[in-house]
């Protein structure tokens, strides 16, 4: 019988199928070897062999506690509890601190209902490892499940005598609550709060008394807690927040019992005991808001805050945040003291340093608030001007630094009061004493609003003298003249900034400014001037491929001189119609000239990568604007990629080189001029 050969399709197995099969095989659990034991002799032989294996392994690695547990479990399965106990005991001699070993040993005794053995074992466990909570809980659960209440209570008492963590105490409390032994719970809490005197412990006791006790018990617990906190405050066990939490809880509980006088007295005593605790004061205010008179509450709050702020400021006169809050309070609650407070603020908080820092800035903001208050609330212009003069002449050290905001505020104040000449003098003085860019900009903005453009030009000239390296100044000056329609001034500004001999602007800044210049000439329809600027743009960009491409695209999108004349003629003939510029073959030709010029430039520089970039751009250009013949012509000019090897520092390395078809054509010998003339004469004779 002929056998069929499997086809390639039949034998093909994908990697995915292989992985799936392996995964499925891995998922299948390997079954343990089944041993059939037929008689007692075979059982003895099996037990002997397994014991030999366990003993041999434990001789090699006696610290493997898991193996000890498995060995003991094997003996338990063989119903040989005597051997199992022996193994557990041997394991405990190796490592008595291994908790799972104790648990398995105890569970083994419990499973065979050897309660006394288990109890003795648990006694040993908690004696050997008294700080392991798990062993205590195991013992307690067993005894409580057997309903041995007294044993459980004695165990808890013994455990808590070691001052364990809060979980042990909480468990003891929960146990006594389950037994409804309320006095026992109180006795536990009396020891609990000594071992763990945290505020949370006291509050737990209070919650217990609220639920299971009476008013007197609850009040006594609160009182005991307050006394304890007061007597042990030097130990710094409790934070201000915890103290306030306890007092607030006590006071609100008294209020719930309608003992409002007790609550108020409690707050007063607590504040006297902890005068720096702001949370207590806040709690008192909250209490008064609920149970006090409105007017008394507001006055109490205001005076209390005033005293607090004055205390803070007497300790640190440079706390400007507190000065602001203090001024807010005085203006709202004590308006008659506001002027005196302002004077005190600007005198006491004046910085001593002669360097501009955050402290000086915040101090000046106090002055600004004072000045704004005088103008808006008092409407006293004379006093306001005096404050400005005082601030400028006596406060700010202009030889070291100044604040432009103050000069500009003063100038705007004078303009609002129709004193423009003095405002100009003030800003001129600011520029003369300590010139700053912000002062110049503010001065320019004011003069622009006043439409004094000649003055604006003079300020810009001073500004440029002060900071000639700031590109933004040149740009804004040019935009100003452009908006005013003075084209010659715009060109003059750009020309001075872009002068080849000037070094105050970086090359990057000049490139940005030159782009603005090109945009300006383009919008002015001075396309030839823009093209000349593009030549400078190429130079500043070090004739990068991108700059050549931008130049070529500019040639496409802008009309030539002849096209401008034609457009003007058409516009004159069709006055009512808008004539739009359309890209013609002439524009495409100018763009191709730029591309070709770039190719020649990179060819002469032997920059093959740059040359390739230009060809790729030309290819994209022809796909948009060219014919199929143009596109094929460009594709034929693309280089052939060749991998070469060169020796670099004694090591051969592979690099990519480009062979351009144009270079190959240039290397071919050109036909003789005489032969070309002869061929041409022969063609003419044939005609």
Curated annotation (Swiss-Prot):
Belongs to the crooked-neck family. Belongs to the NTC complex (or PRP19-associated complex), composed of at least CEF1, CLF1, ISY1, NTC20, SNT309, SYF1, SYF2, and PRP19. This is Pre-mRNA-splicing factor CLF1. The gene is CLF1. Present with 2140 molecules/cell in log phase SD medium. It is found in: Nucleus. It comes from the Eukaryota. GO terms for cellular component: chromatin; post-mRNA release spliceosomal complex; Prp19 complex; U2-type catalytic step 1 spliceosome; U2-type catalytic step 2 spliceosome; U2-type post-mRNA release spliceosomal complex; U2-type prespliceosome. The keyword Nucleus applies. Involved in pre-mRNA splicing and cell cycle progression. Required for the spliceosome assembly by promoting the functional integration of the U4/U6.U5 tri-snRNP particle into the U1-, U2-dependent pre-spliceosome. Also recruits PRP19 to the spliceosome, as a component of the NTC complex (or PRP19-associated complex). The association of the NTC complex to the spliceosome mediates conformational rearrangement or stabilizes the structure of the spliceosome after U4 snRNA dissociation, which leads to spliceosome maturation. Keywords: mRNA processing, mRNA splicing, Nucleus, Repeat, Spliceosome.
């Amino acid at each position: 019988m002929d056998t069929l050969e499997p086809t390639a399709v039949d034998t093909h197995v994908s990697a995915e199928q292989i992985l799936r099969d392996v995964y499925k095989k891995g998922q299948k659990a390997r079954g343990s070897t089944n041993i059939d034991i037929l008689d007692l002799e075979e059982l003895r032989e099996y037990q002997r062999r397994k014991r030999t294996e366990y003993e041999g392994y434990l001789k090699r690695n006696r610290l493997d506690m898991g193996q000890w547990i498995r060995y003991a479990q094997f003996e338990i399965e063989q119903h040989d509890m005597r051997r199992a106990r022996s193994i557990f005991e041997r394991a405990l001699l190796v490592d008595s601190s291994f908790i799972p070993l104790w648990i398995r040993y105890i569970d083994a005794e419990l499973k065979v209902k050897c309660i006394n053995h288990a109890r003795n074992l648990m006694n040993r466990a908690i004696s050997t490892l008294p700080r392991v909570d798990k062993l205590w809980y195991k013992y307690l659960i067993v005894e409580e499940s057997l309903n041995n209440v007294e044993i459980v209570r004695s165990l808890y008492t013994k455990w808590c005598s070691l001052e364990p963590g809060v979980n042990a105490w909480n468990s003891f409390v929960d146990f006594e609550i389950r037994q409804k032994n309320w006095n026992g719970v109180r006795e536990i809490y009396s020891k609990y709060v000594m071992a763990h005197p945290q505020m949370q412990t006291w509050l737990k006791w209070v919650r217990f008394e609220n639920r299971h006790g009476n008013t007197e018990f609850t009040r006594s617990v609160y009182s005991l807690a307050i006394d304890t906190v007061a007597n042990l405050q030097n130990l710094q066990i409790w934070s201000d927040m915890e103290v306030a939490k306890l007092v607030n809880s006590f006071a609100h509980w008294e209020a719930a019992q309608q003992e409002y006088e007790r609550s108020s007295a409690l707050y007063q005593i607590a504040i006297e005991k902890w005068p720096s605790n702001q949370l207590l004061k806040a709690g008192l205010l909250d209490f008064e808001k609920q149970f006090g008179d409105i007017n008394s509450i507001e006055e109490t709050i205001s005076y209390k805050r005033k005293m607090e702020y004055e205390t803070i400021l007497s300790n640190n006169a440079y706390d400007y945040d507190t000065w602001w809050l203090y001024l807010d309070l005085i203006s709202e609650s004590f308006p008659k003291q506001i002027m005196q407070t302002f004077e005190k603020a600007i005198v006491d908080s004046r910085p001593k340093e002669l360097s501009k820092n955050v402290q000086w800035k915040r101090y000046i903001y106090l002055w600004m608030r004072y000045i704004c208050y005088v103008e808006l609330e008092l409407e006293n212009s004379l006093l306001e001007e005096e404050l400005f003069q005082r601030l400028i002449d006596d406060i700010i050290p202009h030889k070291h630094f100044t604040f432009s905001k103050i000069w500009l505020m003063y100038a705007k104040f004078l303009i609002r009061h129709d004193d423009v000449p003095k405002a100009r003098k003030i800003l001129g003085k600011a520029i003369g004493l300590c010139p700053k860019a912000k002062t110049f900009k503010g001065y320019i903005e004011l003069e622009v609003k006043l439409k004094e453009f000649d003055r604006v030009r003079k300020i810009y000239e001073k500004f440029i003298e002060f900071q000639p390296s700031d590109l933004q100044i040149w740009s804004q000056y040019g935009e100003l003249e452009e908006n005013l329609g003075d084209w010659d001034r715009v060109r003059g500004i750009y020309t001075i900034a872009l002068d080849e001999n000037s070094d105050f602007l970086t090359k990057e800044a000049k490139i940005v400014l030159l782009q603005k210049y090109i945009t300006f000439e383009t919008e002015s329809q001075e396309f030839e001037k823009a093209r000349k600027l593009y030549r400078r743009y190429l130079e500043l960009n070090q004739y990068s491929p991108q700059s050549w491409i931008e130049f070529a695209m500019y040639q496409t999108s802008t009309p030539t001189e002849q096209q401008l004349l034609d457009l003007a003629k058409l516009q004159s003939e069709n006055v009512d119609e808008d004539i739009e510029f359309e890209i013609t073959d002439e524009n495409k030709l100018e763009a191709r000239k730029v591309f070709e010029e770039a190719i020649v430039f990179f060819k002469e520089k032997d920059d093959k990568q740059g040359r390739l970039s230009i060809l790729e751009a030309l290819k994209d250009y022809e796909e948009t604007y060219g014919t199929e013949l143009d596109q094929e012509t460009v594709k034929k000019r693309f280089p052939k990629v060749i991998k070469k090897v060169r020796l670099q520092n004694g090591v051969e390395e592979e690099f990519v080189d480009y062979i351009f078809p144009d270079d190959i054509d240039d290397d071919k010998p050109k036909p003789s001029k005489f032969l070309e003339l002869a061929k041409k004469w022969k063609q003419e004779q044939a005609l």
